Amino acid sequence: MHHQTKLDVFIIRAYNLLSNESVISGASLQSVTNSPQTTTNTPSGMVNGAVGTGIANPTGLMGSDSTPNIDEIITSTGSNALTKTNSDSANGTPNGNSSSTSAISNASNPATTGNNASSSATSNGIYTQAQYSQLFAKISKLYNATLSSGSIDDRSTSPKSAIELYQRFQQMIKELELSFDASPYAKYFRRLDGRLWQIKTDSELENDELWRLVSMSIFTVFDPQTGQILTQGRRKGNSLNTSTKGSPSDLQGINNGNNNGNNGNIGNGSNIKNYGNKNMPNNRTKKRGTRVAKNAKNGKNNKNSNKERNGITDTSAFSNTTISNPGTNMLFDPSLSQQLQKRLQTLSQDVNSRSLTGYYTQPTSPGSGGFEFGLSHADLNPNASSNTMGYNTMSNNGSHSWKRRSLGSLDVNTLDDEAVEELLQLTNTSKRQRPMTTAAEGALINDGPDTNLNANNTQMKVDLNPSNSMGPIDTEAVIRPLKEAYDAIISEKGQRIVQLERELELQRQETQWLRKMLIEDMGCVRSMLRDLQR
């Protein structure tokens, strides 16, 4: 059986259940042109040309063609009166919607909370626009819950919003008004008047197999006594996340005027809103930072700091000189010498290698400007005074801490080409670049027991340890949610396109059906005219 037929019967059955077998007015139903919540307030109490007065007495609702009033019509067919009792008002009137009360309902005692989903704002009355909005929001929740629980064994369906269900129900009523006998849903309705309809009871439709199947699927997830959805199945729960029509944002917009006590689970989008666990990258970052800090405390990751401490014997003089003499800091940055010392320790090349011959003797090499390659008798700052000449280079006994390195002791097999490349690109660290070290990174590196380093050395250590950089992890944390969001949007758009294609096909079939009926009616009119002429 086609899923559209099941959906139509489901809408009829759910409407009959949740509206408490109320009367359906084609005039009030068609007055809502677009959707239950986006239209302007039109006279919803208009039935056959009569505008409702908003009072409890329905006897004044007479049609322009002098048809009987609605109360007499329903009473004659064995239904209850259209007057609204106080108990119904206490169960179902939504808060803030007293202005949109039905023209044939009792306006007294409007309660503010309603927990019973099966109770309606009117008892066997005609629904208004605001009430249609609430009713079809409940039908949408019930359908999506039934679909996700697997009660309807049809995998070709998708979650439906209240707007879709309302428009489909509106279309079925229009078909009944155009041709009641030709409509496949005529067996589920009873005509009360020209534009008044009522759905048949369960006892009248107990022999209909599809009606019984839909009723069983509804009662598996819905309790008519309490008016609450019993359970939310998990078999198709994931489809609610990727569908635009069943998304929580749509349902939230539909339920703007709903009552406070509505217990549907789909109206709350907090449990469906997340596309995966987006906190995973942050947790990984925190965990990795904790592990690095722990290793720094235990001395397991102090290789670079030990090498740097060999060339830093007087950190207090280094810090004072850096602050008191900004000119010296501009001429010769201590981070430059530390980076050079670090790279020279890792650089391996034979003494006779031509790759080093000429490089350290050219005017553009680091040996120029009074900075000798041997570093033993180097005048680190010839322009500075004698009290600042030996900062960060003199040990406690007055000798230089740097020693002349023999290039013959370097291993040619462990040559680091990347180190040579970085040596060629060494530049002076400007003051604008130094504050880039964040407080978190400084606290992470300075957490060791023996890290008596200043801010400049902290910046140097961050530069010399690219393995501890959090850049790749931060990039991954930024890219992953974006990718998930784009995938979800693409999936939603794809399903929306498929749904629009289905609706277009249904409208095309309906157009062909109406065209066929029009041709038949024209043929009938022609034959009647011919008979009259004869």
Curated annotation (Swiss-Prot):
Q: Where is the composition biased (Polar residues)?
A: 64-88, 238-252, 312-328
| Coiled-coil regions, chain positions | none
Single GO MF annotation? RNA polymerase II-specific DNA-binding transcription factor binding
Subcellular localization(s) per the UniProt record: Nucleus
Q: Where in this protein would one find the motif Nuclear localization signal, according to its record?
A: 281-288
Query: Region (Disordered): which ranges?
Result: 29-122, 230-333
Q: Where is the composition biased (Low complexity)?
A: 30-43, 89-122, 253-279, 295-304
Mind listing the GO biological process terms from this record?
A: negative regulation of transcription by RNA polymerase II; positive regulation of antisense RNA transcription; positive regulation of ribosomal protein gene transcription by RNA polymerase II; positive regulation of transcription by RNA polymerase II; regulation of glycolytic process
The modified positions for Phosphoserine read 151, 406, 409
Where is the stretch described as Leucine-zipper? 497-534
Q: Which UniProt keywords apply?
A: Activator, Nucleus, Phosphoprotein, Transcription, Transcription regulation
Task: List the GO cellular component terms.
Answer: nuclear envelope; nucleus; transcription regulator complex
Quote the subunit structure annotation: Homodimer via the leucine-zipper domain. Forms a complex with a GCR1 homodimer.
Q: What does this protein do?
A: Transcriptional activator required for the expression of glycolytic genes. Enhances the CT box-dependent transcriptional activation of a RAP1-GCR1 complex. Required for GCR1 phosphorylation.
Q: Please identify the protein, giving its name as recorded.
A: Glycolytic genes transcriptional activator GCR2
Organism of origin is Saccharomyces cerevisiae (strain ATCC 204508 / S288c)
